[in-house]
Amino acid sequence: MFEKLVAIEPVSLIPSAEKELFQYVKEVVLFDDIPADDDEIIRRIGNADAVLLSYTSRIGRAVLERCPSIRYIGMCCSLYSEESANVDIAFARTKGIRVLGIRDYGDRGVVEYVLHELTGLLHGFGMPMLHDEPVEITGLKVGIVGLGVSGKMIADALA
């Protein structure tokens, strides 16, 4: 259990998720604006042992050195690689701070959206039809640009 969690900027939690935080932490502080600089981030974190941030702010070595209470940082944004992260994960590791990001969130919704739009285009549901006659998805040859997680899931759904 954590003592204090601070979301240093808006992290887009739904109300039920905000309530659920109290299962893991005694005190929760959620900021609804983006901090201007490292000094503001340090002030917001204070003595918190858990921190949440989105993609707009950065927690670098200077912040980590001045916030010795941090044990956990939750990145409420994509974490593609340690090198591209907006948290100095390598330095955090040397301080025993666990940093977790979100991977592959929203991918199922992307697949559903693509299939919905493709069906609409092929059958003219809510938009002009691509061809003169409706076309079935089954057996359709489709090119997908990018075969990351979403691209692979779309390919699987169309297979």
What are these regions (language model features)?
Residues 1, 133-159:
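Rossmann-like dinucleotide/phosphate-binding beta-alpha-beta segment
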Residues 15-27:
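A short, Lys/Arg-enriched amphipathic alpha-helix followed by its capping loop at the start of a domain
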Residues 27-36:
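A short beta-strand-loop structural module common to alpha/beta enzyme folds
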Residues 7-12, 32-33, 54-56, 76:
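Structural motif
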Residues 20, 113, 153, 157:
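Rossmann-fold NAD(P)-dependent oxidoreductase module
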Residues 14-15, 38, 59-61, 151:
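Short, well-ordered alpha-helical microsegments
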Residues 49-129:
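Phosphate/diphosphate ligand-binding glycine-rich loop within oxidoreductases
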Residues 21, 43-44, 63-66:
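Structural alpha-helical scaffold elements that stabilize or flank donor/cofactor-binding regions
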